[in-house]
Amino acid sequence: MAPWGIILIAAAAAVFLFVIAPALLIFIAVFYHKKAIPFEQYDLKKYQNHYYIPFLSRIAAAREWIQSKPHTRVWQNSYDGLRLLGDYYDRGAARTAILFHGIGAEMYTNVSAHARFLYQCGFNVLITCQRAHGESGGRWTTIGLREQHDVLSWTRRAEELGAEEILLYGVSMGAASVAYASDKLRGTRVKAAVIDSGFYSIYEQMRRDAHKNHIPKIMLPAQQVLARLFLRVNLKQPTAGTLARAAVPVFFLHGTGDETVECRWGKTNFEACASPKELLLVEGAPHTLSILHNPELAGKRLQGFFGKYFT
């Protein structure tokens, strides 16, 4: 074999070993079906530095409280044929809150406190399990991009269950799911939305995570290419783009102590939103935990917001 042929083979092997293979592994780790951390394992040594740890007892209490209420397991078909799981807490109200959790989260862990609060505010509560998580169908998550259509599917299901007024409440990836759906809500019974700890775009979030975890920058464009090829989504699509056409009032909630999604993205999304809007930055609150970090402040502001748009 000619020397140039050997060089080409060696170069191709190097590209595969040091770029393509690692990029594929990262892609699978980020987007493939999530086996959520069981709530009981958060107290193990492995998670001793997790930001949930100081809040575990309060999360457990909220989880136990909401799960003690009568509820029905429901299923909803997605636009692309997946079966999505939900738990419906019917308190006989005319208004229903639909909750959407974050990536990698077990169905209840990062929305239990929110569900309890909303139930106490007089809402029926529908807790959803996102696609490619837990018992819901799907092999791949798209961190909000396809999930936005699931938001619409669950909205229709809530209407079928008798909801006259609907609140959408998303945390983290769930917040992005709601944000991406925010311009598609005309003609529905959705009266308002809450975007809690929402990011700006998947690509920007991955850029931050890559820097924090010392992952080479070349992996980012590789993820964009792989997402385009295999998932048919654009990781650079900003939530601010759809919020600029938002069809319902939006309450933005973010903690200044959020080390997962920068607080500035909450401000950016708020500024981009075209519909009536409110912003609450909770001093020192970690990711998705504003409602537990300062329940008096967050609760008061949210109840005031609900009072404007729900009967």
Per-segment meaning from a language model:
Residues I53-G92:
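N-terminal cap/lid segment of alpha/beta-hydrolase-fold proteins
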Residues R245-A247, F252-H254, D258:
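Short beta-strand/loop motif that positions the catalytic acidic residue
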Residues F117-G137:
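Conserved alpha/beta-hydrolase
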Residues H133-E165:
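Catalytic nucleophile-loop/oxyanion-hole region of alpha/beta-hydrolase
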Residues I103-F117, Q130:
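The serine-hydrolase catalytic nucleophile loop
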Residues Y180-V233, L243:
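Hydrolase active-site cap/lid region
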Residues M1-S57:
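N-terminal membrane-anchoring alpha-helices
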Residues A285-E296:
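Catalytic histidine-centered segment of alpha/beta-hydrolase-like enzymes
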